[in-house]
Curated annotation (Swiss-Prot):
Gene3D superfamilies: D-tyrosyl-tRNA(Tyr) deacylase. HAMAP family: Deacylase_Dtd. Homodimer. This is D-aminoacyl-tRNA deacylase. A motif (Gly-cisPro motif, important for rejection of L-amino acids) lies at residues 138-139. One of its GO terms (molecular function) is Ser(Gly)-tRNA(Ala) hydrolase activity. Signal peptide: none annotated.
Amino acid sequence: MRVLVQRVSQAAVTVDGQTSGEIGAGALLLVGIEESDGPDDIGWLVRKISQLRIFNDEAGVMNRSLIDCGGEALAVSQFTLHASVKKGNRPSYSRAARGEISRPLFDRFVAELSAALGKTVPTGVFGADMRVSLVNDGPVTIWLDSRNPE
């Protein structure tokens, strides 16, 4: 399971001109799920995201987490995070989980992250063509991969 974490001052996702989720200061999470992902991947990512110290403290040092600062999170499913460009120039998405596998895992990820943060995590619309707008803060962008925890 892969998550691209972006620290934002605000973010929103719309589908067909309708806003499905929006946040103020916090983290935009682009979430990609692979065929072999499962509950253990979710647990690791939820702990890491909720406790990741990427928000400034009073001294301007990145020393606070989403939990510490009461920040918000917006989760958007994105199968293209599992693109492979090993052969040719057209990305292959064969490692990305099909909807019947990825949707329940995405929903569980959102539920567990909501519980960890103590607030609802808004989302995009699973499988839809979405427009994501954001204002990067920093910018701070962190790549998390449950199969390669660095």
